[in-house]
């Protein structure tokens, strides 16, 4: 359709074959098949071949291909077989294939998470309000819009109740546009002036409305502008960036060492023949291969992917990978009360004032709907509709008697909303909201069918009733009315909400989630400060805060109005005093977050409403609500709680700590292994013998090391995961003594491996002598010992400081990886064809025993060092 803004709502509905109650499910399915999903076209994903070729550009693989080329030239000149060349190329091929597989898996995991947080919208189907994924919208669908909703597709407005839409994504104009239903004149009205239209990519910031969808997907204005939506590159976490920097630093360092070894070998050889140059180059390549932790990037990516998938199963959907690392550093969690801390299942348990009038006012000044199984909508509003129904006052019947004909929608600044209804005698306005705010606008009250002046004595009595309910941890709302002879011309809040007649109070209980008390206690044990933020009365907030264990005294609570009297400098000094904030508005949440952040605290903040987006963006970890959250808050959040539960945040923090710990374990294991290989090749070269060839080192790095490293990434959390303080976000990779551990463990494995090489060589010649050149037996023993040593060492890495024998559970995956790596190592040594290809000699039982005994030494030595480190740490305390 074109120029829908020139047509009336009825004309547009007729052209689309729709009606005000929406399409049927059958019609929607038919149109979806015709028009396709409501999605913008994405850039084509690279093919498997393109991904494979991209993997071959990896610097490590380029070095290996250069090594294969040099080896091919050397073997061709000497007339030897091309076995080594073949092995290197197979390793290159396998590594590239593994890279493609892991990249595809990681991408699939991210896509699965994106599906979980897919945008949804409220639509009328078969005359009933249902929630569907926005991608399922079709032309002719009737959607319901309210503050916080992202407009899911282009549409012609059918209703607008003071609705304002921010269309900056389309027009560049940040000022929200006030929408209306009337048709527009003129052939080419600019997009920003089409006040009876709404467009994909814009956001409802105030009011509510109803629209019929006129265009979806690439037919929308956004689709025409976008053409092709560029695919967003997956962001790297700070840890991944640090590892990339580490890789670059190591590459430069290794290049320097390689050049030194290359020149050193040539000088020692005393000749510069082609054969000498090529063989010396292969030694330098061996050193380069030894220094590069081939599996590190893969391990980190896989552990992060598995971690975020596990977190999603526990209702914490990570939208940005950076959040995984930041979670482990969290020091303050600022949480809304309703939803995260309570069950969000409101029930009216107390009320004051005339019951029938109160129930009528609460049900009509309300956007929830009554269905067969109860009310649906925002929990507080649904509770009020159910309360009215329990009095025999069903909302549809009330609406038929008193249809709505005007309104001032709720906003957090006024803390109230008002609706105007037609009656037999004229018009009546109902207002509901925070008791103190509503009461402030009242000049009279109703009692026994009479309207009486609101005296100070009565006002004090009403406030006392409000406090009595609040002290019981009830959420209290007030209702008021105002009569009109004619429909008011001006329906702005400041015009409507004055000279009101007070009706009564409704007190609702929202039960505390049973698991939250334990989660709050777990926070405190983990050195995390839980902070509750609510719009409730201070007395209600204090009662709930005490029950949850967030505060012990009312002095630890403060109101939003008190915050207004504090400067930022004063708030910075006072922020640590308060753990409960009552009567808070969205702008207060931004100030609270920023005050904690200025103190250097890593802060998480929850939010659900459209006005919460700034505070969520300001926080180190923005947490959106999956059930009650608006599209706006979900889109800016780093993490979305699919169950809106505070305990899930604590679970996510624990998982974030576990993931980071495990990545550090894998880093320590891989870098210690690479350190041993570098030192081994370097010192062996200085001593005049070849410890291991490039293919041997590749096998150890990609087979012996990679599987245990991945298994370490799946290690369960250690017993003190949630009883130690958060780590400092500024800490580097090697913080906490990790650098020292890598160094001494690398030296230890080097000594064990070189000792094994010398023993193997001496067993070959039958007497003791320092090896020179290449010793096949020595090389075989070095390979076997280093492989077993690193396999045993992976068992050490289950904990950086604790004895592995004190850990409460076993890592079955690690045991499987260790056994698998050992089996593959044995296969290489025992299958003649493979052993010959690698240049290995048969291994006797005696040699196996010697290698096993030497390799096993890594366990007791590391355990002893850990014991010394633990005692030193205790003395330091």
Task: Please describe what each predicted stretch is.
Residues 758, 763-764, 774:
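Long hydrophobic segments that form regular secondary structure
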Residues 704, 779-794:
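Generic alpha-helical transmembrane segments
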Residues 741-756:
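Alpha-helical transmembrane segments of multi-pass integral membrane proteins
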Residues 769-772:
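Short, charged/polar, low-complexity loop and linker segments
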Residues 83, 774-781:
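Membrane-interface starts of transmembrane alpha-helices
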Residues 797:
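A C-terminal functional module that forms or caps the active site or interfaces directly
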Residues 1-726, 731-734, 747, 762, ...:
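Conserved cytosolic headpiece of P-type ATPases
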